Every structure is written in C-alpha cells, then in structure tokens.
Amino acid sequence: MSSGQNSGGLMSSAGLVRYFDAEDRNSIRIDPKTIVAFGVLFGVGVLVLNALAI
C-alpha cells in the first residue's frame, strides 16, 4: 500500500462528524436518563417473567 491512498481519510470523516452533530429541529429528543430507566425496567421485567416461567 502506498501512503497516497490513505491521505483523505480524516478529511472525509470530518464531514460525516459535522453532518451527524448538526441539530435538527424536527428530530426526536430523548433524555439519556429515560433510556437508562427503560433499560432497567426491561431487565427487571425479563427477570420477573423468567421467575414466573419456572
């Protein structure tokens, strides 16, 4: 591999980072605490269902 093939990697990824960091007014905004709470409730629900199935 020559060093000339990998010269544009950082420049092309910088555009993607800028694209995904852009705020969109119409996007769904979910608080990270809500995601953690949902995950905990889901895990507890799975444990309860496993306990009832035995």
From Swiss-Prot:
Keyword Transport: yes
Keyword DNA repair: no
Cytoplasmic topological intervals: 1-31
TM annotation in the entry: 32-53
Localization per Swiss-Prot or TrEMBL: Cell membrane
GO biological process, one term: protein transport
Keywords, comma-separated and alphabetical: Cell membrane, Membrane, Protein transport, Translocation, Transmembrane, Transmembrane helix, Transport
Side of membrane Extracellular, spans: 54
Membrane topology category: Single-pass membrane protein
Role, per record: Involved in protein export. The function of the beta subunit is unknown, but it may be involved in stabilization of the trimeric complex.
Name of the featured protein: Preprotein translocase subunit SecG
Annotated organism of origin: Haloquadratum walsbyi (strain DSM 16790 / HBSQ001)
